[in-house]
Amino acid sequence: VLSLALAGVALAAHHAVKLSEKDGVGKFFADSKGMTLYIFKKDSPGKSVCAGPCVEKWPLYFREKVAVPEGVSAGDFGTIPREDGKRQTTYKGWPMYYYAGDKAPGDVSGQGLGTVWFVANP
């Protein structure tokens, strides 16, 4: 029984979304490894328009279920099907992405790019 409980804790940690904070950006979501998650303003709730070369620079974030930090509602996270057949995690309906230019946990190199890419804020 204990091993099952510990496996559940490990799974929750692996699928966790956490809050990070940086001067000039404020609070934002990151994955369990601390890599920043982004929102694309050309998307709409429930629909991603980032495809092809866009996805090479902005890889999809996908976890079927995520563990969330205190003060954040798990109900605000979901998943959507994409036209390419993949699935993507959403926050309040908005698809979430990584930025290929971020190399280390806490990097926010994609913030404000093209005035359409922004860190995913709670």
Language model: regions and residue ranges:
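Compact beta-sheet-dominated domain cores in extracellular/mature segments
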Residues: L11-P122
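Bacterial N-terminal signal peptides
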Residues: V1-G8
